[in-house]
Amino acid sequence: MDYNFRGNHYGPRNLTRKEHKKMSNAGFSAPVNYWGAIDGLTPKSSNDGKTSSVAEAPNEYGDTAAHDVYGEVLAPSTEYAVTDEVDLADIVLGSIHSRTIGSGASAITKKIMLTTVAITTQANNPPTVTISGVEVESGATAKRTYALAGTLTPRSKAQDVCGAFTASANFTQINTNAAVDPHVQTVGGVPVASDASHGRIEVQATMTDPTGNGAITAANAGGFTVTASPAETDPDANYITRAATATKYLIGTEAE
């Protein structure tokens, strides 16, 4: 610890903000922001999701006499803290991103497709966003993309960010999952072509009835359809809760 001379004795010196930050982060890993800068989102953690394929040659007993590992690919994800308002239009399903993996002579640039956005919001907890995708061919460009709409705030409350429900009860948790199905063709385990389809948004909500009269409903809103009607739970010595799911299917836009 550093010391400053104070009057007739030495005492501990308060660290500057910069010094404190440097000490608190010493040895910590830095999350990888696979999906580029998005206003209102700060990377919190990441995972490269690497997988490989294994070819096996059995002998007459069925034992593996030889094997080889090939076709390592990424399926990366980044979890974000919400630090300001987020315009969901800044997150595009099916979009293609370039990321350099490694450094120096071993550095390699990979192309990845954004396939999934998972938003978790609930009472008394700050929201989180996780964006995931898959590796595609080295020369990939976006072919079909799917737009999102809505605003997410950093407030610690349940948020129907896509406007999926009209409800007569209090939301306590809402999870929003938007996704496309990636289609990646490989040769020898290496991606050589890709596309995306079947864009959709699924919103799962939990509601409570503070009056205890069971009048809990969820209705279609914002182009969504209630695909799982509110399922009622009647706990002992507590209020009624219901969980509902609403789904919206998206029409993609062809790249020009």
Annotate each PLM feature:
Residues K18, M23-V82, G104-V134, K143-T211, ...:
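Solvent-exposed edge beta-strands and adjacent loop segments
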Residues D236-T245, Y249-E256:
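Hydrophilic extracytoplasmic domains
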Residues E85-V92, T211-A218:
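Short, conserved charged micro-motifs
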Residues E85, G139-T141, G212-N213, E254:
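Short, cysteine-centered beta-strand-loop-beta hairpins and adjacent loop/turn segments enriched
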